[in-house]
């Protein structure tokens, strides 16, 4: 097959999809406004969109929209793909829809349908148009399909749930030697409980709530260490967070990882961690959370529908209000003081991940969807 993706090339999720299909021998093209970043993926033809860069975000959006639409149309005519697959409906999905190319698949990521359309009437119309034009829309969470039907009138027979899942060949326990070296590198003592936030340093992940909880956690457990993985974060917001950390006097308890890290590196960080915190107000069931659970970390997550697909409060996770640092403090301290929960939760979470969220199995499902749409 000749597959053309429209997606953000510096996203680890995009990179996994294009690499999988390229490795399977398909001809893979990726249209993106950004390069791959720190990695290089062989046998994937990257088509970079040219963009204007006005300082004001809204002006940038208005200026780039027609420019990107024209470029995407020209590229699709040049590539002549068998199938188009756009990830993130609010922009790449809209661009793909305007080409009138079929078969055309959309993948909803979460905020592109849960948050962004509520902030802008223009974006809402773009999302509605893209959904209307798509042959199939994939979601990772059960509730997301119901939401698309209820809020956008998308017929159920055009929705397919294919969890992205995680690579269980990478994300698992057993990196003892690497964990030892990482603790030494980060100067974390052997008896120090480790908490990790592996979501991007961005306001939507309620990082500020985590920061406000830390001094209360370290008051009870002074040797507790929190690791922040910056990822594809917001640099201005990161400055605000670092300033607040200094104001609270908790610099010695924080480890910032200011770069993208490979999946293998992430697995070692997660194996090092006792507790994982993920508290956005809207989300699909994030792969980053499942990766942490597969490595044995206790999940503390926001009390939202997405996480309830697999998790139950106090049974294999802890739910909190993402606006409440006090509740986060209490649950984190409870986890630190009850280390036996780590093994109990791990056994439950490992089972559902292996059954339903194995990346290798779900990638095959996506390939089968492509073939069905092409009548092969």
Where are these regions (language model features)?
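Aromatic "clamp/platform" in nucleotide-sugar-dependent glycosyltransferases that forms part
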Residues: 281
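Conserved donor-binding/catalytic core segment of Leloir-type glycosyltransferases
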Residues: 4, 189-205, 211-214, 227
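Nucleotide-activated donor-binding/catalytic signature segment of Leloir-type glycosyltransferases, i.e.
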Residues: 238-260
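Carbohydrate-associated surface elements
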Residues: 143, 165
């Amino acid at each position: 097959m000749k597959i053309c993706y429209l997606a953000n090339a510096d996203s680890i999720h995009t990179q996994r999809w294009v690499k999988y299909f390229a490795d399977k021998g398909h001809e893979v093209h990726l249209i993106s406004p950004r390069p791959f970043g720190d990695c290089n993926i062989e046998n994937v033809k990257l088509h970079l969109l040219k963009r204007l860069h006005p300082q004001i975000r809204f002006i940038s959006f208005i200026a780039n929209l027609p420019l990107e639409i024209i470029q995407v149309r020209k590229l699709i005519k040049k590539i002549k793909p068998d199938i188009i697959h756009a990830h993130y409906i609010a922009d790449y999905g809209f661009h793909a829809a305007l080409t009138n190319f079929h078969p055309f698949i959309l993948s909803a990521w979460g905020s592109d349908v849960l948050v962004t359309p509520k902030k802008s009437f223009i974006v809402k119309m773009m999302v509605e148009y893209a959904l209307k034009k798509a042959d199939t829309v994939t979601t990772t969470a059960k509730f997301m399909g119901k939401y698309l039907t209820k809020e956008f009138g998308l017929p159920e027979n055009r929705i397919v749930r294919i969890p992205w899942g995680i690579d269980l060949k990478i994300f698992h326990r057993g990196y003892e030697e690497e964990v030892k070296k990482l603790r030494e590198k980060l100067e974390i003592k052997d008896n120090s409980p480790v908490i990790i936030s592996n979501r991007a340093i961005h306001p939507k992940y309620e990082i500020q709530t985590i920061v406000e909880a830390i001094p209360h956690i370290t008051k009870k457990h002074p040797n507790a260490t929190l690791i922040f993985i910056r990822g594809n974060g917001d640099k201005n917001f990161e400055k605000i967070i670092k300033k607040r950390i200094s104001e609270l006097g908790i610099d010695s308890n924080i480890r910032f990882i200011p770069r993208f890290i490979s999946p293998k590196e992430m697995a070692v960080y997660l194996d090092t961690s006792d507790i994982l915190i993920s508290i956005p107000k809207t989300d699909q069931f994030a792969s980053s959370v499942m990766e942490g659970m597969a490595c044995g970390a206790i999940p503390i997550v926001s009390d939202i529908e997405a996480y309830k697909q697999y998790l139950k409060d106090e049974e294999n996770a802890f739910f909190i209000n993402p606006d409440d640092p006090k509740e986060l403090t209490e649950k984190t301290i409870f986890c630190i003081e009850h280390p036996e929960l780590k093994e109990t939760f791990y056994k439950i979470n490992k089972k559902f991940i292996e059954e339903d969220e194995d990346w290798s199995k779900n990638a095959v499902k996506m390939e089968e969807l492509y073939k069905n749409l092409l009548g092969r």
